[in-house]
Amino acid sequence: MAGIFSLGGNNNNNGDEEEENQQQQKTNWVWYRSNANTNNINPSSSQQVWQIPPEQMLMHHHSHPQQQSLDLYPGHQIDVSDLATSSRSITISCRDCGNQAKKDCTHMRCRTCCKSRGFDCSTHVRSTWIPVARRRERQQQLHMSTSGGGGGSGSGGAGGGGSSIPKRHRDPTLPGTSSSSRLPSHSAGLEMGEASFPGEVSSDALFRCVKMSGVDDGGDGQYAYQTTVNIGGHLFKGILYDQGPESSYMSGGSGGSDHQSSSAGGGGGGHPFNPPVVTDGGGGVSSAMFVDPNSGGYYSSNMTTSVFMPPGTQFYQNPPRS
């Protein structure tokens, strides 16, 4: 049934007796529309007008106490008979806190308020949610209890605390580093494969002044000193960048030279492993940053086998061999 529309009218008279008589003799005409015959072409066949006695209307109202009526204007009402679907979307609020009440709570309260007041309700169910840490701990304890033999006895000490979770063993050394790549200050020497190098060396060396300029510098560069030494039968090359006046730059090494090696090539904007263009101090000819170690003016044969190198100096790892 789609709906019941009351079409009967109320005629108000001046006399009280006539009004009571008319109310007793009043009949209600109801317009009924059938939804089962919607496919019929004739519209009059799906619409009927019924007459409902007052006694049946009174019994209908008493049998449906939850039925609602909307007053459009005096004398005409719309009775909403299908409340089953509309009641599903209605939410009940808690009488204490105003939050949404539990659906099955007979006291119309939320779980917290209903439980705090001590009401006997079926919604007082303990939550089955377990934190992740406790679940992981239970799984580990179950795994240790199921593991047999020496595995169970060895892991029993770790799980004896209950709350302590065994962790992985962490390597104290950083990834990508090794003890052989760092030179400790207290070590007397460094051994790499078959070669053995001293921890500190001191000797005379020839430093050549060169002008360093990058590709994006636009011709502006800075002066640096380049040298090549022989230590332990191996050839080492390096460039010493200008670090500024001695008063503004505190040297970290024990040498008294005004020019120190840069740890990352920050002084000239270039890196020793990616050398920029080198220009000689006197001439304007640009050349690559490679010097022949066998030249008499640059490398002396009577040079001692050791030379002083302050800590932090970087060299070419693979120098060209003649």
Swiss-Prot record:
Residues 175-184 have a biased composition (Polar residues). Its main location: nucleus. Keywords: Activator, Auxin biosynthesis, Auxin signaling pathway, Developmental protein, DNA-binding, Metal-binding, Nucleus, Zinc. Signal peptide: none annotated. Residues 247-263 have a biased composition (Low complexity). GO terms for molecular function: DNA binding; DNA-binding transcription factor activity; metal ion binding. Zn(2+) 1 binds at residues 94, 97, 105, 110. Residues 1-25, 132-196, 247-286 are annotated as: Disordered. Residues 94-121 bind DNA. Disruption phenotype: No visible phenotype. The double mutant sty1-1 and sty2-1 has a reduction in the amount of stylar and stigmatic tissues and decreased proliferation of stylar xylem, as well as shorter siliques and rosette and cauline leaves with a higher degree of serration. Hypersensitive to 1-N-naphthylphtalamic acid (NPA), but restored by exogenous application of auxin. Residues 147-163 have a biased composition (Gly residues). GO terms for biological process: anther development; auxin biosynthetic process; auxin-activated signaling pathway; pollen development. It is found in: Nucleus. GO terms for cellular component: nucleus. Expressed in seedlings, roots, cauline leaves, flowers and siliques. A motif (Required for homo- and heterodimerization) lies at residues 231-234. Zn(2+) 2 binds at residues 94, 110, 114, 121. PANTHER family: PROTEIN LATERAL ROOT PRIMORDIUM 1, PROTEIN SHI RELATED SEQUENCE 2. Belongs to the SHI protein family. Transcription activator that binds DNA on 5'-ACTCTAC-3' and promotes auxin homeostasis-regulating gene expression (e.g. YUC genes), as well as genes affecting stamen development, cell expansion and timing of flowering. Synergistically with other SHI-related proteins, regulates gynoecium, stamen and leaf development in a dose-dependent manner, controlling apical-basal patterning. Promotes style and stigma formation, and influence vascular development during gynoecium development. May also have a role in the formation and/or maintenance of the shoot apical meristem (SAM). This is Protein SHI RELATED SEQUENCE 2. It comes from Arabidopsis thaliana. The gene is SRS2.
